[in-house]
């Protein structure tokens, strides 16, 4: 303190409020006014304050659009997501239809449900597929005390599709699924990851988990993992989730990712 006395005194002076400074304003003039969203958003974009921009849009809403921009925006809106065309696979032969659909489309969203969030320790509980918007399936292989398909038979059935380089595999954090499948003898090929795409495009703008991306890009609130398994003392393993509930959750994951 003795050595830096001068700096300490300067710092004290800098933080001392001048209560004698003339303020020629009426208190009513300090009342919070309506934000000029367009002006605020323009400034935040110019300064590249992406996190603040995201927070501002969340607080004040989307900016006003011109007529042409509004028309473009309306054409980009997705149809509401429904689970009416989500299917629970109870016969292994039903998988053939989904394989054929994926091969014809040349792309398929793939998602795995497991017993653990650590892919190295996880056991496969189910697989969801989607090659057409609004249509997805869930293949249960590891739900406890419930009728599931034989895991080895399902893996053998899907192996050629998942390793086919001519069919693009789309995933959200697909590294997780890659590890799960690799442990079962499948090496995924031709992969694209929506989480990585989001990070490359908007690294600091928002979070890149599926729930956030669905809300931003599709205007759809997804079923959260916690809604399915619970929290705290009431939390259960995904392998204990009822098949119908698991189907709606897992198929939605694949559909939203696609």
Predicted features along the sequence, with ranges:
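Active-site-proximal helix-loop-helix substrate-binding element of RNase H-like nuclease domains
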Residues: 80, 118, 122-258
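Non-catalytic alpha-helical coupling and interface elements of nucleotide-dependent molecular machines
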Residues: 16-22, 45, 49-65, 202, ...
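Charged catalytic cores and adjacent phosphate/nucleic-acid-binding surfaces used
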Residues: 12-13, 48, 194
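Short coil/turn segments at secondary-structure boundaries
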Residues: 12, 16, 24-31, 54-58, ...
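Long, highly charged low-complexity segments
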Residues: 26-127, 141-145, 150-161
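Generic hydrophobic alpha-helical scaffold/packing signal
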Residues: 2, 15, 41-44, 57, ...
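Accessory alpha-helical DNA-binding modules that contact the DNA backbone or grooves
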Residues: 1-12, 21-24, 66
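Short, solvent-exposed helix-loop connector elements
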Residues: 1-3, 23-34, 235-246
């Amino acid at each position: 303190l003795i050595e830096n006395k001068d700096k300490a005194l300067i710092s004290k002076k800098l933080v001392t409020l001048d209560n004698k400074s003339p303020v020629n304003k009426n208190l009513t003039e300090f009342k919070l006014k309506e934000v000029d969203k367009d002006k605020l958003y323009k400034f935040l974009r110019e300064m590249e304050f992406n996190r603040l921009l995201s927070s501002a849009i969340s607080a004040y809403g989307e900016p006003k659009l011109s007529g042409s921009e509004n028309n473009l925006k309306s054409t980009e809106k997705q149809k509401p997501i429904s689970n009416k065309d989500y299917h629970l696979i109870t016969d292994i032969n039903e998988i053939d239809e989904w394989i054929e659909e994926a091969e014809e489309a040349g792309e398929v969203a793939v998602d795995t449900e497991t017993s653990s969030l650590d892919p190295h320790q996880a056991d496969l509980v189910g697989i969801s597929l989607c090659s057409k918007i609004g249509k997805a399936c869930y293949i249960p292989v590891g739900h406890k005390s419930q009728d599931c398909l034989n895991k080895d038979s399902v893996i053998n059935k899907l192996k050629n599709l998942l390793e086919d380089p001519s069919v693009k595999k789309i995933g959200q954090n697909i590294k997780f699924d890659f590890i799960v499948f690799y442990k079962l003898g499948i090496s995924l090929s031709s992969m694209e990851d929506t989480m990585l795409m989001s990070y490359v495009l908007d690294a600091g703008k928002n979070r890149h988990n599926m729930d956030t991306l669905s809300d931003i890009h599709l205007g759809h609130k997804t079923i959260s993992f916690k809604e399915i398994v619970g929290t705290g003392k009431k939390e259960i393993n995904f392998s204990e989730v009822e098949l119908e509930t698991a189907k709606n959750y897992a198929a939605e994951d694949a559909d939203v990712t696609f």
